[in-house]
Amino acid sequence: FGQKNIFKNLILGFVLGFVLQSLTILVIYLKGGYSIISINPISFIIPPLTMAIASSIIEEIIFRGILFRIIEEKLGTYISLIISALIFGLIHISNPNSSLMAGLGLSIQAGLLLGLAYVLTRNLWFPIMIHFAWNFTQSAIYGASVSGSKMSKTLITSEITGNELFTGGQFGPEGSIQATIFCLIATIVMLYLSRKKGRILKPYWKTTIANNGYN
């Protein structure tokens, strides 16, 4: 998980996840597709809060903490990012109301973004909190579907209508084009910072060649 800068990573992760999801919803709202039906008691956030905590921790341990690191050790950061992101996206195709495009979108939004969040910090708390904030904001606060599933109790009961390109349809806002664009921008920034900080690992064969050449 990493012991350094835990509080900083938690705060930054929450802010980033919240902002990315809020921008996604904002686009839907500006296009007239987001309507608030009712505002419910604060206790209504407990079910989606619990779900967001569980899914973010479990999925990040599996995909970034285990799968990504195993692949990265042999094949390097770039190949590991691509493989783990594709697996993450394809697994979500089995979700309700999902599709191949939704899965590919999640590969970019979550797979690459969260993978690079780990690479940048070498700390699981950062991607866990981004993941949590994204799901929590989308479901508990804005009352939207998350990866094809909609909670019955949320802080805001909302209705989302309009072009599925911008709403994500029944899959939820994370299936929208703007969600992919916003997350891709954040991914590019993290890639730049990761390269600048020297956090990118080479494939084992390049490391071996370099060491043999040096010796």
List the predicted regions and their residue ranges.
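Functionally important transmembrane alpha-helices
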Residues: 103-164
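Hydrophobic alpha-helical transmembrane segments
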Residues: 10-15, 45-46, 78-83, 104-105, ...
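Small-polar-interrupted transmembrane alpha-helices in polytopic inner-membrane proteins
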Residues: 21-24, 51-52, 56, 76-93, ...
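Alpha-helical transmembrane segments of multipass membrane proteins
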Residues: 16, 20-24, 55, 84, ...
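Juxtamembrane helix-loop-helix connectors linking adjacent transmembrane helices
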Residues: 1-61, 68-73, 203, 210-215
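Membrane-interface helix/loop boundary segments of multi-pass membrane proteins
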Residues: 58-83, 87, 116-123
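Structural signal for membrane-spanning alpha-helices in multi-pass inner-membrane proteins
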Residues: 24-29, 88-95, 114, 142, ...
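C-terminal membrane module of polytopic membrane proteins
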Residues: 137-215
